[in-house]
């Protein structure tokens, strides 16, 4: 195997280790914060942290279990019996099991001098599922936790060291999850264009810079009006859920479980853009962007008209220039990325494809695993080229 290929396998393995470590670090930070709140007598804050953790974990395990059940029989080879897997997910360990499975397969492939096509394809299959689950966990748990911690800090006027650790890990974790998801989608393209260093930095930064004003707007509103933030979230979330439903998503294996996906996507859309349907992607992205921007402006107007000071005595005017600066810089980087660095490709129909595996056989005569869930999303995320061949690799 060429050194470049072995280097790519090692890079994927290292990124897998870092992703798993980041998940455990984020989990530990949240539990640490909950314990500190409880020890300080702030039981409501501790309960909110644990509730967000619990709800996100249950959703994550449901996704993982439903996907395992939908995968073709024999795809995962030697794995624990279904009852053991069900117990792992019931104990909220299904995601970690998948992480261990991915790392083990990645290490196996890297150690082989000439890994088989099946082993390489199976490693990609596992990594794609992990990337999607990580994205779900990020917006179901990390983004709400970040908003909660910021609201607590702004309301109390003081920041503990564990809160600063949580804020830093949350912002980096969210941006990294979006970058990893985008990188994973690129592996589903026919030409498999890699996300270069420059493209990665720009994609990471514009997500971070656009996320900060949104989280700050909601956190400041929560600090000023803690009794109304749940109503605000529910109202917007229902509108976004209706929008997702109208787009006719078909990501999950059956119609009943599709609602779990729609509920999750609506939560993601509350914080950031997420494409779920083919067609006028740019138009839908602009509509969503204008919707979130209008909502954030309304939140800012609410601060200004009701109070110019936070309960902690911090003037709100200090935060507005920071949020505006991040917003315009993030918007500029986003335009740069989508104008010059976003790839397009030609998707050729594959009517003979069965769920979870390519219909074409490898030279050895067995089917190569293909993660159709992520391939389906990639077909929606990336524009189609006008010519018959994939466009030149960008970034």
Curated annotation (Swiss-Prot):
Maturation and modification: Phosphorylation at Thr-375 activates the phospholipid scramblase activity.
PTM annotation (Phosphoserine): residues: 362
Keyword flag Nucleotide-binding: no
Entry's Gene Ontology molecular function annotations: phospholipid scramblase activity
Subcellular compartments: Cell membrane; Cytoplasm, Perinuclear region
Site keyed Cleavage: positions: 355-356
Keywords (A to Z) from UniProt: Apoptosis, Cell membrane, Cytoplasm, Membrane, Phosphoprotein, Transmembrane, Transmembrane helix
Residue list for modification Phosphothreonine: 375
Extracellular side: 34-47, 180-200, 245-259, 306-312
One Pfam family it belongs to: XK-related
Membrane-traversing stretches: 13-33, 48-68, 159-179, 201-221, 224-244, 260-277, 285-305, 313-333
Any GO BP: positive regulation of myoblast differentiation
Record's miscellaneous remark: Expression is repressed in PLB-985 leukemia and Raji lymphoma cells due to CpG methylation near the transcription start site of XKR8 gene, possibly explaining the inability of PLB-985 leukemia and Raji lymphoma cells to expose phosphatidylserine during apoptosis.
Protein family: Belongs to the XK family.
Protein function: (Microbial infection) Incorporated into Ebola virus-like particles, where its phospholipid scramblase activity is required to promote phosphatidylserine exposure on the surface of viral particles. Externalization of phosphatidylserine on the surface of viral particles is required for uptake by host cells.
Subunit and partners: Interacts with BSG and NPTN; which act as chaperones to localize XKR8 at the cell membrane.
Protein name, entry field: XK-related protein 8
Annotated organism of origin: Homo sapiens (Human)
Organism classification: Eukaryota, Metazoa, Chordata, Craniata, Vertebrata
Gene: XKR8
